[in-house]
Amino acid sequence: MAGGGVVVVSGRGLSTGDYRGGLTVYVVMVAFMAACGGLLLGYDNGVTGGVVSLEAFEKKFFPDVWAKKQEVHEDSPYCTYDNAKLQLFVSSLFLAGLVSCLFASWITRNWGRKVTMGIGGAFFVAGGLVNAFAQDMAMLIVGRVLLGFGVGLGSQVVPQYLSEVAPFSHRGMLNIGYQLFVTIGILIAGLVNYAVRDWENGWRLSLGPAAAPGAILFLGSLVLPESPNFLVEKGKTEKGREVLQKLCGTSEVDAEFADIVAAVEIARPITMRQSWASLFTRRYMPQLLTSFVIQFFQQFTGINAIIFYVPVLFSSLGSANSAALLNTVVVGAVNVGSTLIAVMFSDKFGRRFLLIEGGIQCCLAMLTTGVVLAIEFAKYGTDPLPKAVASGILAVICIFISGFAWSWGPMGWLIPSEIFTLETRPAGTAVAVVGNFLFSFVIGQAFVSMLCAMEYGVFLFFAGWLVIMVLCAIFLLPETKGVPIERVQALYARHWFWNRVMGPAAAEVIAEDEKRVAAASAIIKEEELSKAMK
């Protein structure tokens, strides 16, 4: 959905009027079903750390870790889970996801958003079933790779699809539905792990349900409408108008449809190869850098270190296995509740405000965690921490989770999905997902080794990065709240810093935007004149 009305160009940026359509029951249902794709990523992220701490799973696949846990702590308790095979199990999914999302951009542009979602769902079903029946480490990794292919495809296409079907005034709310379902998936995984913690083959019941969100996405792709943008791009103009009218709940979509058609006319002659080539020109460099860097920042908040390894972390600090798994459920519940706040307020307060506030909150929480662990382990050495201290650390981690869940979590997916023009969107969103999976792989592969080597310092490491993130959000990120997707590039062209990065292309973008503003204004005036004459 184009999202936006007449744009009034001012000296400082863009403001928007209203298109005729608004939030309808139909568009909410469509967004809800597509956002279920977030369950794929969420369930897998949530189940990974918990299943690793299940006794039967450890004995079968990671006997070295199990043996180390049974020994008296003579070395640092931070090193209990420092195991190469365990790190490969966690991070292999993200390596596969990185590969699949490179192909996802081609599939999305040529076969459509629906087909891409269907293929991603099918991969996830296959991966969940393979893991549920895994007999050895090799089979486990194959299942993880299949899951990675599914997550890569889903993560690339679902945010893009949501941005294209959502009305601009509610784009943030509906797009964050994806992140909300990621958090719901994490919570469900925590509940499943806790429920099966004492079962001999409970780990199979933890890994197997991963097929369920894949099935939901696959079946949903059969009934969801294709996005108007893709239909127009493929020459199905009238069908695109019909879908847009249904999404908007009104037949008066001329201005919005004109925006979509104009954007498609620019993008149509551009091949996928040209789309990738265009992305690396100065004209599109601001969006490219924003998209990639925000993925780096999202992962270097330390979020996946927490989500992957919450049970592992608390086990390392001396908590009993059941208590460690229960802590995961608590963290998951806080995650869901805080993401709901982002759903309600992202279109009210804007992206930058949430990133800045959330970044400061996360930084203080990481700093507190590092300092408390340094002080307490100096007191207790390799002995388990007292329950009161562990509970305090859990509370601080929940503060971190809440800050992330209404800021860098949802904005890390929302912002890249709304800043690219149609001709660069497939390649641009692919770059965002590649960045996300690349840095998720790095964190998944390295965190337990970092924890072993840096001890409490690993939390101070993430706190330092959070300071940098907040400063970048303050000075370098344009506010995209309420700005139509097709005109976000003009927002960058008028930004004090990105204007210089774009060079002469900035003036070209501003001139093109002014022409489109005039055209959209003329269409609306015609409509008003026609109504007045009736």
Swiss-Prot record:
Cytoplasmic side: 1-21, 109-114, 166-173, 226-299, 350-352, 409-433, 478-534
GO cellular component, one term: membrane
Regulation: induction: By glucose.
Segments passing through the bilayer: 22-42, 88-108, 115-135, 145-165, 174-194, 205-225, 300-322, 329-349, 353-373, 388-408, 434-454, 457-477
Keywords assigned by UniProt, alphabetized: Membrane, Sugar transport, Symport, Transmembrane, Transmembrane helix, Transport
InterPro entries per UniProt: MFS_dom (IPR020846), MFS_STP/MST-like_plant (IPR044778), MFS_sugar_transport-like (IPR005828), MFS_trans_sf (IPR036259), STP/PLT_plant (IPR045262), Sugar/inositol_transpt (IPR003663), Sugar_transporter_CS (IPR005829)
Membrane-protein topology: Multi-pass membrane protein
Subcellular location: Membrane
Side Extracellular, residues: 43-87, 136-144, 195-204, 323-328, 374-387, 455-456
Pfam families associated with the record: Sugar_tr (PF00083)
GO molecular function: monosaccharide transmembrane transporter activity; symporter activity
Similarity-based family: Belongs to the major facilitator superfamily. Sugar transporter (TC 2.A.1.1) family.
Functional description taken from the UniProt entry: Active uptake of hexoses.
Protein name according to UniProt: H(+)/hexose cotransporter 1
Organism of provenance: Parachlorella kessleri
Gene: HUP1
